[in-house]
């Protein structure tokens, strides 16, 4: 895919060594600044997975850049009260840090798989994570309030994909009600981000097809 597109893979400062998470708005400011310095005037596609969907949604509703398509893979669209987020923060911190302490040994307890292809990324995330950064991120993420508005035109080019076996599938109905003009493919029999993890080439080809043909490709596991 990088042979056809200028691919940018931003990572939250929460998982970067020596960086300080300030707020969602600051994260967006950093991404916007990078795009401006690179001379980017249009985005063919924005892709976000899991909790990255929360930050991506904030980006979509604030950026002035034209966006061709959007693809959410197993988006974490939870709406959680501030009290619950406060309680879950230390537990989440220990879970992520354990990935580093155990050299990836606890990954299978957190995710459905512990493939060697993804383990290094989770270990690095656990190593770099600080409690302060995580607390700040959770304090302004997954908030218990209505989803931000997206224009009908952008909704028509936005794909909210979920695996039928993943826990995040439970958010699908609420997202469909918030964005009725969007597309909601279901990957039958698939778990959280399974297609992206197990067949990264196929996943990339799917994204390219959406960007170029304005539709999902014919995939045998898409629920009819």
Protein language model annotation of sequence segments:
Residues 179-193:
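Catalytic histidine neighborhood in serine/cysteine hydrolases
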Residues 61-97:
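Flexible "cap/lid" loop of the alpha/beta hydrolase fold
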Residues 47-52, 56:
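Gly/Ala-rich beta-loop-alpha elbow adjacent to hydrolase catalytic centers
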Residues 82-83, 99-152:
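Conserved alpha/beta-hydrolase catalytic His-Asp/Glu region
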Residues 190-202:
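Catalytic histidine-centered segment of alpha/beta-hydrolase-like enzymes
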Residues 136-177:
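Conserved serine/cysteine hydrolase catalytic core
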Residues 8-45:
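Active-site loop/oxyanion-hole signature of alpha/beta-hydrolase fold enzymes
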Residues 1-8:
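Short amphipathic alpha-helix adjacent to the substrate-entry channel of hydrolases
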